[in-house]
């Protein structure tokens, strides 16, 4: 594919793919590649602009990712974001001060040069999101300061060479006018053309699946979630009956999940094979408390189940997964400069060696794009807007060791939360809601009897893309009702808490 693109050089930021998403939203094709990609390869690409991403690293670290200076001689507009700006300053002879003026969260920015194309059509002050430990102390020669906060230089430019820097993150939804800044860079500075659409990409994906798979068969673990269902219908569109959907009952599912999954067979004419492996999964998780170990065990068990199926049908060659962009980002290892948050069983929990080839047709799309694809595929609202459920299931919502008793307790508590959300017309107003069971017991009193039982935590968030999220401010009356029902109806819980943590710094799931 030689479509002209905006190129994002990834220095390991968790937001690198989010930058790409923002640009694709305005109709411009975007590619994300590692910062260490050889300059020769970059020269051979058809690109109209380059963005240097942020990074968890410090420019002063011995292992800090750096950049070939020759990239600035390509006469292509360049925008550095956060670490990207700091590396520009360092390479051009400016001064970056280590840990001098850290800023995290919301800050007010003031424009010094309102004539710059980067800040065209913007007010002279607005709120932005900062996330940096190092700061610019001295800008390089031939650069000028475009904007500042009370604590740091917020933006610089070399207008002649079309090199720009931002200390803040315009790609994050909570940065005011971030979309406009990105548009200004893409259209006014890079002169990029609109050349990307979701519909066009869908046609391309279907063709790629047909070409890659050929006459071979594909198996897909169907979880009932949006991602796996969209993935299934997309692959079915490409290879029809050669898709075999496998529903593995791990015993770690939501209440009555097996019935809901099997209903999909008739709704969407899917070939679904049901396998009850609940005893095996639970036995393998015995005495395991570490969340990473739980994820990897579950990932391996899934593959074992699928590989046994392939022994029955030698024409099965591919294992399909509904892996999406945010899964990939959060599972990046430190080897690629990105701080690892957690491994997803979709990408980080699979064994290195397996006989099946991997097929991940959705791994370049964000959650809201997946939903749009689902709409185009005719998926019903109750399936399409169902709250996400992790591949490892309740194993990562039970903190610590997983037991059958804890699974039963959590299934009932989580079901009560879901019921009340529907009763109060709140379910579709929240992007994700679930209950976490803590390995913490506390004293309570019920009917003049002393109790010593588990603590449950309600987690509800709103988000556009699952890269950042805000906790949902639910009515106290609703929380009171849910808490009362859980404590009175679920044996084993005598205390309910509400999680009011946003992402970042917290992740949505607890493990």
Swiss-Prot record:
Resulting phenotype, residue 78 to V: In strain: CA-11.2A
Protein name: GMP synthase [glutamine-hydrolyzing]
Keyword field: ATP-binding, Glutamine amidotransferase, GMP biosynthesis, Ligase, Nucleotide-binding, Plasmid, Purine biosynthesis
Active-site residues, Swiss-Prot/TrEMBL: 82 (nucleophile), 169, 171
Native source species: Borreliella burgdorferi (strain ATCC 35210 / DSM 4680 / CIP 102532 / B31)
EC number: 6.3.5.2
Top-level taxonomic group: Bacteria
Record InterPro entries: Class_I_gatase-like, GATASE, GMP_synth_C, GMP_synth_GATase, GMP_synthase, GMPS_ATP_PPase_dom, NAD/GMP_synthase, Rossmann-like_a/b/a_fold
Effect of residue 112 to K: In strain: CA-11.2A
CDD domains, alphabetized: GATase1_GMP_Synthase (cd01742), GMP_synthase_C (cd01997)
């Amino acid at each position: 594919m030689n479509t002209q693109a905006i190129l994002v050089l990834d220095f390991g930021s968790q937001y690198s793919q989010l930058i790409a998403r923002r640009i694709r939203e305005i109709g411009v094709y975007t590619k994300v590649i590692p910062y260490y990609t050889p300059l020769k390869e970059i020269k051979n690409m058809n690109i109209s602009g380059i963005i240097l991403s942020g990074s968890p690293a410090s420019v002063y670290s011995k292992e800090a990712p750096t950049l070939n200076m020759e990239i600035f001689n390509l006469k292509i507009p360049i925008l550095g974001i956060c670490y990207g700006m700091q590396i520009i300053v360092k390479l051009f002879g400016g001064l970056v001060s280590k840990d001098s003026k850290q800023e995290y969260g919301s800050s007010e920015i003031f424009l010094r040069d309102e004539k710059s194309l980067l800040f065209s059509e913007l007010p002279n002050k607005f709120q932005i999101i900062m996330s940096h430990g190092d700061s610019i102390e001295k800008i390089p020669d031939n650069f000028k300061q475009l904007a500042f906060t009370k604590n740091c230089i917020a933006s610089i430019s070399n207008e002649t060479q079309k090199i720009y820097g931002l200390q803040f993150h315009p790609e994050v939804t909570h940065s005011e006018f971030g979309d406009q800044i990105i548009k200004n860079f893409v259209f006014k500075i890079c002169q990029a053309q609109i050349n990307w659409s979701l519909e066009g990409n869908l046609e391309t994906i279907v063709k790629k699946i047909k070409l890659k798979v050929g006459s071979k068969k594909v198996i897909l673990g169907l979880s009932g979630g949006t991602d796996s269902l969209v993935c299934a219908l997309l692959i079915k569109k490409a290879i029809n009956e050669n898709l075999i959907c496998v529903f593995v009952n791990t015993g770690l599912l939501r209440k009555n999940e097996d019935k809901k999954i099997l209903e999909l067979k008739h709704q969407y004419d899917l070939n679904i094979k049901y396998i009850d492996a609940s005893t095996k999964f639970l036995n393998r998780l015995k005495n395991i408390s570490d969340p990473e170990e739980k994820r990897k065990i579950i990932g391996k068990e899934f593959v074992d189940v699928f590989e046994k199926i392939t022994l029955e049908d030698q024409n099965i060659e591919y294992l399909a997964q509904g892996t999406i962009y945010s899964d990939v980002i959060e599972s990046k290892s430190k080897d690629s400069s990105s701080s690892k948050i957690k491994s997803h069983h979709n990408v980080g929990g699979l064994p290195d060696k397996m006989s099946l080839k991997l097929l991940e047709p959705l791994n370049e799309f964000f959650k809201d794009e997946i939903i749009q694809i689902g709409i185009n595929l005719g998926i019903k609202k109750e399936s399409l807007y169902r709250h996400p459920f992790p591949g490892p299931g309740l194993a990562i919502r039970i903190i610590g060791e997983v037991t059958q008793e804890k699974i039963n307790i959590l299934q009932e508590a989580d079901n009560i939360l879901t019921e009340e959300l529907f009763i109060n017309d709140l379910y579709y107003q929240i992007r994700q809601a679930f209950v976490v069971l803590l390995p913490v017991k506390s004293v309570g009193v019920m009917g003049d009897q002393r109790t010593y039982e588990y603590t449950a935590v309600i987690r509800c968030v709103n988000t556009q893309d699952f890269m950042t999220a805000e906790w949902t401010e639910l009515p106290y009356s609703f929380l009171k009702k849910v808490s009362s029902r859980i404590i009175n109806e679920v044996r084993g819980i005598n205390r309910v808490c509400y999680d009011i943590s946003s992402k970042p710094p917290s992740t949505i799931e607890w493990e």
